[in-house]
Amino acid sequence: MSNKQNATLNITGMTCAACSNRIEKRLNKMDNVKAQVNLTTEKATIEYDTNDYAINDFVTTVQKLGYDVVIDKAELDITGMTCAACSNRIEKVLNKAPGVKDATVNLTTEQAMVTYYPGQTDLDTLIGRIRNLGYDAQPKQSEEDQATRKQQELKHKRNKLMISTILSLPLLMTMLVHLFNMHLPDILMNPWFQFILATPIQFIIGWQFYVGAYKNLRNGGFNMDVLVALGTSAAYFYSIYEMIKWFSGATNMPHLYFETSAVLITLILFGKYLEARAKSQTTNALSELLNLQAKEARLIDDNGMEKMVPLNQVNVDDILLIKPGEKIPVDGQIIKGETAIDESMLTGESMPVDKHVDDVVIGSTMNTNGVITIMATKVGKDTALSNIIKVVEEAQSSKAPIQRLADIISGYFVPIVIAIALLTFLIWITLVHPGQFEDALVAAISVLVIACPCALGLATPTSIMVGTGRAAENGILFKGGEYVERTHQVDTVVFDKTGTLTHGKPEVTYFEGDKDTLTLVASAENNSEHPLATAIVNYAKQHKVNLVNVTNYQTLPGHGIQAIIDDSMLFVGNQKLMLDHQINIQSIKQKMKQMEAEGHTVMLIAYDGKLRGMIAVADTVKASAKEAIQQLSSMNIRTVMLTGDNERTAKAIAKEVGIDQVIAGVLPEDKAHHITQLQEQKHNVAMVGDGINDAPALVKADIGIAMGTGTEVAIEAADITILGGDIQLVPKAIHASHKTIRNIKQNLFWAFGYNIAGIPIAAMGLLAPWIAGAAMALSSVSVVSNALRLKRMKL
C-alpha cells in the first residue's frame, strides 16, 4: 500500500544553478521520488513513499554530493514522567515523528534532546506530540528557572507527603494490631474512621497516579502509575465492598485494607520525594560550572565612561575594564595593562599566568593583581566556559549503549507484571487457598506494588550524570555516555608527541660556555624568527643577559647562522659548519653525540676562529608524562607514540617516559592508517592528540582524546577533551570510565535482581503489600544513592 509523503529539506552549500540541478537530478533518479530544488530559497521539496525511504536517505544523498542539510537541535523540559516506561514511550514517539533525525529522553534530567530537519517539523509540533501522550513539555528553561521550578516541585512533593503521612499514621497503627496483637482505641478500628482517612489519600493525594495511568492507557502505554493505581484501588475498593456488607447487617467485623492502600501511596510518595532530592544532587557539577560565570561587566562606553552592565548586554568588540580580584566577564584580548590570571577553573593550573597586551584572556577566570582593559572577542554561548557547559549538559543527557537492555525490558515490564499479578491471584484462589479471595487479592496487590520499572530507568542515566559531572570537575570532558562506555574498553593508548607528551615548543636544555658566549649567541639569534632562535633568546633573558649590536647577520641553510660582533665572526650551527671553517671540535664531540642521541638539537658556537661552547635545544617532555604512562601501564594498557618526528628523537623521548612502542616519521594524513592497523590487531584504541593536526586519527580511533586549553577546547574533534593539556588526566579519564561503568553495572544488577527476586517472593505471599510498597519506593532511591557515590570518586 502506497504511503506518499512530502518532505522539505533546507540545503546549504549551493552556489549556482548547476548545484541545484545536480541535486535535483540525483534525487529524481531514486525510485518513485519526485524532487524539486530551489536555489533561491535553498530548499528541496521531495515527494516519496515512506515504505521505500526515510528522510535520512535523502539527507545522505545530498551529503554525498558535497552539500549539507540544515539540522536544528532542540532541548525540551518534560514534566509528568514517573518511570522508564514513560521516557521510553516519549522517545519512541519522537524518533518516529517525521523530520526527526534523533531523539533521546533522559528520565533523570527530565529532558529531551531532539535533532530534526527544520523544513520537516518544528518545536511546536514536537511539543504537541509529547503533550498528546499526556505529558507536558516546553523549551528548555535557563538553569536558574529550572532550579526554581524543581525547588517548587520538591516543596509540593514534601507537602503532599506530610499530609499523606499524617492521615496514614492512624491507619498504620491498625497494621500493628495484626502484627503485634496490640490493643488500640476502638475509633481506630472503626470502618467509617478508616474510610474518612483513606479516601482523601486515595483520590486527592493519590489522584496523580490515576491521571498518569489514564493518560498512558489512553495512548496504549503502561507505566508505574498503572501498577500503583491498580494495586491501591484493589485494596481500597475491596475495603468498600466489605464496608457495604457490614453496613448491610453482616455480624462479623469487616476485613478492611484501607491501611494497605493509604500506606502504599504514602510510602511511594516518600520514595519519590527521596528520589527527587537525590536526583537534584546529580547536577551539582553543572551548577558549579554555571556559578563560575560573572554576572555583570564594567563597560567603557564611547565617551570613556565606566558603567556596570548585565553580562547578556556585552557584545563582541566592546571595551571592558577589569580590576584586581574580579572575574574576566567574557573571552577577550588585552589592549591595555598587564596582570596575572588565575586560570585554575579551566586548566587546573594553580599558578597564575602572566598576561600582557595582545594576550588572550578567558571568561570566568580570575584577575589577581593588575588593572587591565580588554576587547571582547567571544560572548554568550561562544565563550570557552559556555562550550564546556554545553558539552557537560549533552553528556549528562545522552545514553550509553549499556542502557539498551534496560530500555527494552522496561517497555514490556508493566504488562508482564500485570499478567503475573493476575496469574498469582488465580493460582492463590484456585490452588493455594481455594476460595480465599482476600489471600489471593493480597498476594496480587503485593506483586503489583513491589515491581519497580523506575530503578531500571534510573540505573544508567544517574551514573552517567554524576560520573561525567565529576570528570568535568577535574578537567575531563566526555562528549556523551557512549564515550564513557567505549573508553572503559580501551586497551591501547596512542600518543602524538609534539604538544601532547612534550610542551610543543623548543627550550634550551643544555648550555656549555661562559656568560659572554651566551651574550654572543643570543644577540645573533635575536635577528631570527626561527623557533630554536626564540628558545635561545628566551633562555638568555632568563639569565639576565644584555644583548649587543650585530652586523652582517646571515642564515646558512642546512648549517646554521653567522654574524659579525665587535669586528669578529661568530658561527652558530652544526658540526659541518665548524669543519668548513676549520674549527677544532674534538673537546666537545663526545658530549655533542650524546645529546643528539637523546633527541636534542645541538648547535656549536665558534667566535673569532675558536670553539666557545655548545647549546642544545629540545621540545621538552611534560613533567607529568612519565607518571601518566606509568599509570596506564599499571592498568595493563599498552602505550604507543605516533609522530612525524625522526626515529632517534622519538625513541629518546619514548625511553624517557616509558612508552612501549614508537612509530616515527609518520605524515599527519597517514596517522589514521596506523590507528586502523592497531584496530585490525583487535585492539580498542584511544588516540591522544592536539585535536587539530591529528583530527583524522582522532576520528578514526575508538576514542579520540584532544588535549585542549581554555581557548582551544577541541570539542568537535574528539570524544573526550582534556582541559589545560595535563596528560595525567588521560589515565584519569580511563579510570573515571571504569568507575562509572562499574557503578552502572551495580545499579543494573540491583534493579534487575530486585525485580527478579522481589516479584516471586511477593507472589508466594511472603510480603505484606505495605512492605512490598516500601521496598518498591526505596529501590529507586538506592539506585540514585549508589550513583551519587561517584561524586566522591578519586581521580
Curated annotation (Swiss-Prot):
Q: Where in the cell is it found?
A: Cell membrane
Per UniProt, Cu(+) 2 binds at 83, 86
Q: Which domain of life is it from?
A: Bacteria
Q: Where are the transmembrane segments?
A: 161-181, 187-207, 224-244, 256-276, 412-432, 440-460, 747-764, 770-788
Keyword check for Ion transport: yes
User: Under the GO molecular function aspect, what terms does this record hold?
Assistant: ATP binding; ATP hydrolysis activity; copper ion binding; P-type divalent copper transporter activity; P-type monovalent copper transporter activity
Q: Give the active-site positions.
A: 496 (4-aspartylphosphate intermediate)
| InterPro entries, alphabetized | ATPase_P-typ_cyto_dom_N, ATPase_P-typ_P_site, ATPase_P-typ_TM_dom_sf, ATPase_P-typ_transduc_dom_A_sf, HAD-like_sf, HAD_sf, Heavy-metal-associated_CS, HMA_Cu_ion-bd
Q: What is known about what this protein does?
A: Involved in copper export.
Q: What is this protein called?
A: Copper-exporting P-type ATPase
* UniProt source species: Staphylococcus haemolyticus (strain JCSC1435)
